Amino acid sequence: MLVFTDLIFLAIFAHIGKATAKVWNRNVQGFLDLNLPNECSQYTTIYSDGPSEYTSTLPYTHSFSNASVYTTLITITNSQCTGNYSTLTISSQPLIHTNTSISKPSQTATPQNTNTTQVSLTNGTTTNSYSNTNSLPITDTINGTTELIIPTTSYNNQSHTLIYSTYTSTYLPNSTIDLSILPHSTISTLSTVSINDTSASLSKTTSPTAGTITETIVSGSVGYTSTFPASGTTSGTVEVVEPTAGTITETIVSGSVGYTSTFPANGTTSGTVEVVEPTAGTITETIVSGSVGYTSTFPANGTTSGTVEVVEPTAGTITETIVSGSVGYTSTFPANGTTSGTVEVVEPTAGTVTETIVSGSVGYTSTFPASGTTSGTVEVVEPTAGTITETIVSGSKAFTSTFPANGTTSGTVEVVEPTAGTITKTIVSGSKTFTSTFPANGTTSGTVEVVEPTAGTITETIVSGSVGYTSTFPANGTTSGTVEVVEPTAGTITETIVSGSKTFTSTFPASGTTSGTVEVVEPTAGTITETIVSGSKAFTSTFPANGTTSGTVEVVEPTAGTITETIVSGSVGYTSTFPASGTTSGTVEVVEPTAGTVTETIVSGSVGYTSTFPASGTTSGTVEVVEPTAGTVTETIVSGSVGYTSTFPASGTTSGTVEVVEPTAGTITETIVSGSKAFTSTFPANGTTSGTVEVVEPTAGTITETIVSGSKTFTSTFPANGTTSGTVEVVEPTAGTITETIVSGSVGYTSTFPASGTTSGTVEVVEPTAGTVTETVISGSVSFMSTITAHDTSSGAVIVVEPTAGTVTETIVSGSIPFTSTIPAQGTTSGTVEVVEPTAGTVTETIISGSVGYTSTFPAQGTTSGTVEVVEPTAGTVTETIISGSVGYTSTFPAQGTTSGTVEIVAPTAGTVTETIVSGSIPFTSTIPAQGTTSGTVEVVEPTAGTVTETIISGSVGYTSTFPAQGTTSGTVEIVAPTAGTVTETIVSGSIPFTSTIPAQGTTSGTVEVVEPTAGTVTETIISGSVGYTSTFPAQGTTSGTVEVVEPTAGTVTETIVSGSIPFTSTIPAQGTTSGTVEIVVPTAGTVTSTTGSGTSWFTTTVPATGTRSGSVIVVSPTAPACSSTPFAECPNLNFNFHSKNVNFPPADIRVISVTPKGNNMYDATVQFTTSSTMSKKSLSELKILGLSQTYLLYSYNSKVDNISNPGSWTSTVTVQGTSTGSYICMPHFQIQYDWCSAGVTDMSECNTWSYQKSYDYITGCNNYDNQGNSQTDASDYCWNVC
């Protein structure tokens, strides 16, 4: 063994002598004096634990792989000595199995199972090796410590080289290898040499393979991001392996996976998203199947194919099954085409229906770009016979047709409810969507088929689901698509929820023909009890030119195994976009569990993948989650949600969101009635369309535990000279006893007029006006955003998140309403969104309805008006109520248009309100690119009477206006807080941003005012918040703005934190003028105890060419005098570049530019940082300020913090406690820490050329420097005069 180690040393030593040897060298002197007899005997070491301790990290310059050895060398030289040099060699080989040649090529090392360390000293031709007392190499395990005894005589006139050699394999456990070398001798002063090699920490996560796991949250959220700026290749794998053995209780399997790839030019990508369900054991109360989406876009001459398949368990007993769902078909032809579509749902035709969910949601969409005519009727026929108790019937259908020129289309969507037979608590069918668009001379065909189970007993199973297919051809193409759901054909069906949601959309941009049929066949035989079948799949493909695509989405229901009360699968999305002549293929497959015992378990998780390619590259990615493979898992919730965003830097843009709302557990006894309606019409030229979508709820009888109605969407687009009208009305039940009801929901209206058209639309939700309503949750939330600057069309999604479990108390009233209107030329639009809160009666523990969205777009000479109104229940007692929420208004005028809009929320004005959170946030956006005028008012009226206890008052309001040319706009956002009554423990109002942009010769003014409560008793109140004003003038414009927060002026205020932070930013690139005032008025009356006054304000303006600017930011703090002193450097003459040069990171200028006293010896200090050497923010993982009373995160990928725009130049305000040094106060030391090229960084182009370290700290201080003034810190301490 001694001979072997000698060979190791000789080989390494010989390697050192080569001129081409790549080693890591550092020459460090003067850190340790061993008090040896003469000057030349001073031992120079790079490591020490003495007063001048210096720690370094041994870097790895190679990737770890099997059968490799890597060596790190650190040379320590005493330059004051001459003569015969010796070498101290310390080599360490970790506990790794390998057979790697580590010396001469002819010599091969034996497999290592220990760390081997030896010391060799050479004087010319003589080499002495030192190890342990028996002359064998010293061994230890990873994380162990080796002690070497080195004779004193070995120190004289030696040059010492420390060599750290490492064997590696494909797997090295999580560890930090600490190698300690203690030079024992007769000399009185010794040192400890510590090598803390944190970069040697390699990790690989393996799932537990045995043991018992209880109440475990498995898996989770994984993100993979890769960015290639040019001709690159990337691959990523995220794997989810479900448990394959053992007993799992209360598990929900599968989850949500997203894959996104973007190629701006001539690229190819392929991606596979696969979820493997557990393959062994018995599964009880499991959620199987799920939701799959596939999207592919080809802008030129490409071909794509995609298959989305869900394989359900193929046999066994399934009980409590919900079948059927929603189906959508969309086809688009740009010119001179004809299309027809029929969406039909055939419900079961015989028997008695009990506890059925009736009706639902219907949508009709038609688009005519030129001289066309279309008509559409969507009719929901409620059940006409039998006994119906707690029934939710029907579902959601949408029909969309678009004709850009001289076409004709007609469509009928009919839902036939069950008229007879015995059906108990069953949800049948599922949801499918088919969309096809042909941009040029292409052909596509797609089939979406759901095959329900054909035999056996099914108990409490959720099967089927939702499938979507989308294909786009811009010219002269043909497409056909069939979406068919075949329900189980045998057995008895009990407790069935029938039908679901179907959507049909067809668009013809050019001389094409398309036909589509969406048919749902309900089950005609067999025994199905409370079963939810299948899941949701979506497929989207777009071809802008001469391409061909085909896609098949198939769901195979379970044919084997015993499954009881099982909800299978989850949600999967795949999106790929190709802007030029590429090819892509993708397969999304969900394999359901085929064996094993799984009981009420939620596994899986949430995965996101994002890739961006600005130029001709190739990428492939696989997202896979590996779940635990053995053990017992009880009551585990995993899963999650996924979001998708993709941007094309050239010739294309795409975006998308994948959201999964998992059930949250518990017992759900309330029934959800009805569903969602959508209406879309688009007329690009000289066309006319009309459509009516009406849902008639049951008007008589006894309905118990019912959730009524849902979400509606109306979209109309007129590119030229067309007219359209549409009404979407939901009539809630007007009679009977309703208990534990979730009422209504979310409504959206969208209209687009590119030229000289007129449209009107009304979306009204009438809440129940009579009866007793107890423990009611009212539907959900909608957000819609659309901007059309040319002859394009955009639409948004309506998402309703219903509660899934538990008993709901302490009610939240109303919700969120966005309004968007866009008029690109000579148009006029007006819109009103009003929410009327309950004004009287007895309402107990009620959560009232939801969210309404209105969108209108006018590209040319059009007019539109729309009203979205939500009428809350007007009678009853309201106790422990949280009152509504947020309203948004957006209007855009590209040319000579006028628009006005009012968004008003009227809170309850009478009755007893206890523990109420009032209102929320309201954004307003208006854009006028040329010669236009717009005005908007957003007002929130808080409750003005009654007793309010423990109330959180309103929230945030935003106003945005943009004027590209010669326009004028004004806007007022006002929040009126309650003016009477008793208010205790109240948080008042919130944050208000104001943004206005005028690129040419325009004028804009805006006022944002928050009026706090002016009377009553206020105790333990946090007042108001943050206000922002932003104005940008690209040319010859003028703007002024005032943001004022008026705090309460009367009453008793105790333990109050007043106001907050206000930013003001104005930019004038040419010959402009701007002025702005931000003022916070602190309460001037009452008792104020333990109060922190005001907050942070800043004013920034940039004038690149001869302009004028003025700005005032005034913060009036209660009773505290204003005091600010200019800070100065305590030791300005030291050399602060010395430390960064030696440690190899960029030099920087670090200053404290201002301080403001806060009282009690606390100060706000503003730090300014600049450096000439930096990478961009895309290469930054984290930036923070350390060493103060708290850590200040300026940027963090993992924590989602981004408070800087340029990593090389920024300012930040921190709070510090001053240190008194006589006549002035000094700031404590602090550090600035940079971490590059690690967490979240996917584009390594800058990292690969960066000449400095990837992680380093800047240090401040005046207490560590040598006789030449070379400082071991990077900036001076800063002090200021005592104020």
UniProtKB/Swiss-Prot annotation:
GO cellular component, one term: cell surface
Glycosylated residues in this chain: 66, 84, 99, 115, 123, 143, 157, 174, 196, 266, 301, 336, 406, 441, 476, 546, 686, 721, 1203
Domain of life: Eukaryota
TM ranges: none
Keyword rRNA-binding: no
Compositionally skewed regions (Low complexity) per UniProt: 107-132
Cross-referenced InterPro entries: Flo11 (IPR018789), S_pombe_Mam3/Map4 (IPR051905)
Chain segments carrying region 26 X 35 AA approximate tandem repeats: 211-1120
Mapped Sequence repeat ranges: 211-245, 246-280, 281-315, 316-350, 351-385, 386-420, 421-455, 456-490, 491-525, 526-560, 561-595, 596-630, 631-665, 666-700, 701-735, 736-770, 771-805, 806-840, 841-875, 876-910, 911-945, 946-980, 981-1015, 1016-1050, 1051-1085, 1086-1120
Predominant subcellular localization, coarse grouping: other
Annotated stretches, region: Disordered: 102-132
Signal peptide region: 1-21
GO biological process, one term: flocculation
Record's keyword terms, sorted: Glycoprotein, Repeat, Signal
Residue ranges of domain Flo11 in the record: 1118-1283
Subcellular location: Cell surface
Matching PANTHER family: M CELL-TYPE AGGLUTINATION PROTEIN MAM3-RELATED
Function summary: May be involved in agglutination during conjugation or other aspects of colony formation. Induces flocculation when overexpressed.
Entry's family note: Belongs to the mam3/map4 family.
Name listed for the protein in its UniProt record: Putative cell agglutination protein pfl5
Organism, scientific name: Schizosaccharomyces pombe (strain 972 / ATCC 24843) (Fission yeast)
